[in-house]
Amino acid sequence: MQLIIATRKSQLALWQSEYIKNKLSQTHSDLEISLEGFKTKGDVLLDSPLAKIGGKGLFTKELEESMLRGDSHLAVHSLKDVPSFFPKGLVLAAISKREEVNDAFLSEYYESLNALPKGAKVGTTSLRRRMQLLALRPDLNIISLRGNINSRLEKLKAKEFDAIILAFAGIKRLGLEKQIKFVKKFELDEMIPAASQGALGIESIDDKQILKYLECLNDKNAFVETHIERDFIKTLEGGCQVPIGINAKIIDEKIEIRAIVGLPDASKILKEKRMIDKQDYAKAGELLAKEMIAKGAKEILKEAESMI
C-alpha cells in the first residue's frame, strides 16, 4: 500500500516526517511511503509575531487541505501546533513518544538566564515564554524572533541577540546542542512548556485501514499527558497565541501538573501545581482549567489578547 505524508519543508518538520516514515516502514514492510512538502501560512508570514497573525492552524491548514483533497494520507505535526478541533474527515490518529518537554536557554556569551546583563536582548516570539522570562527577569529586553531553528541560531551567532529561547526537543532532534556554546534547559518550575510540547501528533484521513497502520506510533504515556494538556487548553479556549503554559508529567502512578496563564508583560500571573492519581487523568485538564477560570483565568486571557 502507498502512503503519502504531507509535511512542512523546514528541517525540523522534514526530520519529524522522516522519523515517522522510518517507524512505519520498520513495522509494516508492505508500505511504500513518500513525503510531499508544503509551505504553511505560519512559514510564509515571518514578518509578524504569531500572536498578531492570529487564527488557529497556522502550521497545519495547508497540510489538512492536502489530505482532504486526497493528495496525501497523513501529516506529522509538532502536537503543540495542532488545534483541539479537526476538520470533518480528519482525525488525530496517533501521538508519539515524547521528547524532553523543557524550553532551553541558548547563548554564545552567557551560561544562563541569571548571567545575562541588565537589559540583555532575548529572542522569542512566544508570549508564554515572554511572560515567564519577565517574571524571572523583569529587566530583560524581549524581542520577537521568527523563522526556523537554523535561521534563529544564525541570528544568535550574528550577535543580534544575547540569548534566545527554543524548545529543547527541536534542538535535540536536529543534533544542534554542540553548535551553541551555552545550552541550558529550564526547570519546569521556572518555565512551564506549551501544551503537548515535545510530542508529535499524527493526523490522518479517517480511514480504518490507515488508522490500523498508524496504531504502532502511539505512546500510552504521551497520550495521557497530552490529553490532560489539550483538555486544559480546550476548556480555557486558548491557543498558541496567548500566554498559557501547561505540563502534565507521569511519575510512577501519579501525575504532576503545572499550569500558568497571565499577561505578556508578567504584570498578572495565575499559576497552579498539583499531583493527582494517574487513574484520574481523563477529566484532570478540564477540572484544573475550571478551577483557574473561577480564579479569573478567562479575564486575564481576554486582557492578554487586548495587549497583543
From Swiss-Prot:
Task: State if Transferase is listed as a keyword.
Answer: yes
Keywords for this entry?
A: Porphyrin biosynthesis, Transferase
What residues bear S-(dipyrrolylmethanemethyl)cysteine in this entry?
A: C240
Task: List the cofactors.
Answer: dipyrromethane
InterPro entries attached to this UniProt entry: HemC, Porphobilin_deaminase_cofac_BS, Porphobilin_deaminase_N, Porphobilinogen_deaminase_C, Porphobilinogen_deaminase_C_sf
What start-end ranges are recorded for coiled-coil regions in this protein? none
What functional role does this protein have?
Tetrapolymerization of the monopyrrole PBG into the hydroxymethylbilane pre-uroporphyrinogen in several discrete steps.
Protein name per its UniProtKB record = Porphobilinogen deaminase
List the source organism: Campylobacter lari (strain RM2100 / D67 / ATCC BAA-1060)
